[in-house]
Amino acid sequence: MSQMSWTYIADDGARYDVGLFHGDSTGHLLVYCNARIVVIDFSVLASKNYSFFINDELCDLVIEEKDGKFLYGFKVDEVTDTARNRGRRKMLRTEVRQSLLIGFLF
């Protein structure tokens, strides 16, 4: 059975332990965040993606099958249209405008 774990630290400093268990022969998958199960899937024997929220942050779990082996990845989704990502883009635009304004003044 394959096991992986990651630690996500939120903006407020809260710590979230994300992990998975993936059966080698059955392909059964369990993904958890702290002590809460967020995904259960059966017969995952090919590449697949899963998305779930940690607070208001959309996270992606990637399972990639390559030459009979599985590779696992965890990342924060900063592209999909969510309230958090809209706020992130708005803040970035503001910072760019401020940088350009300061650059023109000096």
Model segments located where?
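Cysteine-centric segments in proteins
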Residues: 1-106
